Curated annotation (Swiss-Prot):
EC code(s) of this entry: 4.2.1.2
PANTHER family listed in its UniProt record: ASPARTATEAMMONIA/ARGININOSUCCINATE/ADENYLOSUCCINATE LYASE, FUMARATE HYDRATASE, MITOCHONDRIAL
Name the UniProt record assigns to this protein: Fumarate hydratase class II
CC per GO annotation: cytoplasm
Similarity annotation: Belongs to the class-II fumarase/aspartase family. Fumarase subfamily.
Organism: Neisseria meningitidis serogroup A / serotype 4A (strain DSM 15465 / Z2491)
InterPro entries according to UniProt: Fum_hydII (IPR005677), Fumarase/histidase_N (IPR024083), Fumarase_C_C (IPR018951), Fumarate_lyase_CS (IPR020557), Fumarate_lyase_fam (IPR000362), Fumarate_lyase_N (IPR022761), L-Aspartase-like (IPR008948)
Keywords for this protein: Cytoplasm, Lyase, Tricarboxylic acid cycle
Misc: There are 2 substrate-binding sites: the catalytic A site, and the non-catalytic B site that may play a role in the transfer of substrate or product between the active site and the solvent. Alternatively, the B site may bind allosteric effectors.
Pfam families with a match to the protein in the record: FumaraseC_C, Lyase_1
One MF annotation (Gene Ontology) recorded for this entry: fumarate hydratase activity
């Protein structure tokens, strides 16, 4: 492999000749051969956006030259356009501040900027990775800013639209299924009736609440640490830098980013990420419940509940011919399990900072962005390949409805709870209908039973 010599404050390092990264990135590659999980692409792009905003702010404040800002901007745009995707090889399992990944970005942008300027790789003139790309920044404020920017962008552009689309599909189903009366179930046992539309309306409401929690979490993610520099004091940054840089990021992203009012919290804690993960976990709990309900309702086709049909997308067994499984439900619930685990990691990592800095940021970023991506993808997949094709099975719904012993609840007001319980237990013991049993016990006439036990009248207060 052909190499070139790069240097940092510890000396010279050989770097692949075609690489845009420099000495500190290469040291990290050499020292942290742990796993294969690299930092997510949205985080890389967010960090490039941070550098672009910083350059624009610094030149406006007279801290770097216009030529340097222009070159950094061009290089950052190359990153954002995907032209340098292969230049960020570092694994998650590195320094907990993300310093090596911050320097990876600084080195790549500096080398690309100097290549554009015609001075070539490793020249670091006219653009230096620390003095110009990283000007008025520390990893300690740039990296958490990138986490917030990446998470906010991904939640807004990927997750929220996916959840809304699934929510809207389920809402359409709820409206279409409104006239269909079915038996309810609690504790996996028969309960009183409701409509299939009411059942689905519960799913819609869960997702509405989930969207609300995501929007609440975004409020904290919009607060940026940039300008806190090393420990939150803003050392080596212009007094106006923090506010202007946040405003520039808001302009570049189209999202309402602001400078965090307290930089010590913004560097020392990762509470916004923990809260966002909590919202993701709660959304996962909702989606897990919805997917489980749907696969139970679709169980069968002959020996299960079978009250609804879901699309048949692929063969389900390598040995049982004709078997089809609820695969979208299974994929969704596996995603939810992963998100639950990610939340545990993020919670522990967020709680483990010391004094002025949290040093678990790469693992927080990795798990947070994975949860966002997986939930968004899973909602899109579940919506497209399952939810839109859900259809009721009226004959199965009607069978269970009229064979349920819990219709006896409608008799409470007429014959009392204890007598109604006697009817249900006797009917079950003798394998007879509720109507027949109530008449045999002398508690009601058949006509009275028919007037009282009307499933369609049991789905609302009366």
């Amino acid at each position: 492999m052909n190499t070139r010599t790069e240097h940092d404050t510890m000396g010279n390092v050989e770097v692949p000749s075609e690489a845009y990264w420099g000495a500190q990135t290469q040291r990290s590659r050499n020292n942290f051969k742990i796993g294969g999980e690299t930092l997510p692409q949205p985080l890389i792009y967010a960090l490039a956006l941070v550098k672009k905003a910083a350059a624009a702010t610094n030149v406006s404040l007279g801290r770097i030259k216009p030529e340097q800002a222009d070159l950094i901007t061009q290089a950052a745009d190359d990153v954002l356009n995907g032209k340098l995707d292969g230049q960020f090889p570092l694994v998650v399992w590195q320094t907990g501040s993300g310093t090596q990944s911050n320097m990876n970005m600084n080195e790549v942008l500096a080398n690309r900027a100097n290549e554009i300027a015609g001075t070539g790789l490793a020249a670091y003139q006219p653009v230096h990775p620390n003095d110009h790309v990283n000007h008025a920044q520390s990893t300690n404020d740039a990296f958490p800013t990138a986490i917030h920017v990446a998470a906010a962008i991904e939640i807004n552009r990927h997750l929220i639209p996916a959840v809304k689309a699934l929510r809207d599909t389920l809402d359409k189903k709820a409206q279409a299924f409104a006239p269909i009366v079915k038996i309810g179930r609690t504790h996996l046992q028969d309960a009183t009736p409701l409509t299939l539309g009411q059942e689905f309306s519960g799913y819609v409401s869960q997702l509405d609440h989930g969207l609300g929690r995501l929007n609440d979490a975004l409020k904290d993610l919009y607060e940026l640490a940039l300008g806190g520099t090393a420990v939150g004091t803003g050392l080596n940054s212009h007094p106006e830098y923090a506010e202007k840089a946040a405003a520039k990021l808001a302009e570049l992203s189209g999202l309402p980013f602001v400078s965090a009012p307290n930089k010590f919290e913004a560097l020392g804690g990762r509470d916004a990420a923990v809260a966002a993960s909590g919202a993701l976990k709660t959304l996962a709990a909702s989606l897990n419940k919805i997917a489980n309900d749907i696969r139970w309702l679709a169980s069968g086709p002959r020996c299960g509940l079978g009250e609804i049909k879901i699309p048949e997308n692929e063969p389900g067994s390598s040995i049982m011919p004709g078997k089809v499984n609820p695969t979208q439900c299974e994929a969704m619930t596996m995603v939810c399990c992963q998100v639950f685990g990610n939340d545990v990691t993020i919670g522990m990592a967020g709680a483990s900072g010391n004094f002025e800095l949290n040093v678990y940021m790469p693992v927080i970023a990795y798990n947070l962005l994975q949860s966002i991506r997986l939930l968004g993808d899973a909602c899109n997949s579940f919506n497209e390949h399952c939810a839109v094709g859900i259809e009721p099975v009226p004959e199965k719904i009607d069978y269970f409805l009229h064979h349920s012993l819990m219709l006896v609840t409608a008799l409470n007001r007429k014959i009392g709870y204890e007598n109604a319980a006697k009817v249900a237990k006797t009917a079950y013991k003798n394998n007879k209908s509720l109507r027949e049993t109530a008449v045999e016990l002398g508690l009601l006439t058949g006509e009275e039973f028919d007037e009282l036990v009307v499933p369609a009248d049991m789905v609302h207060p009366r």
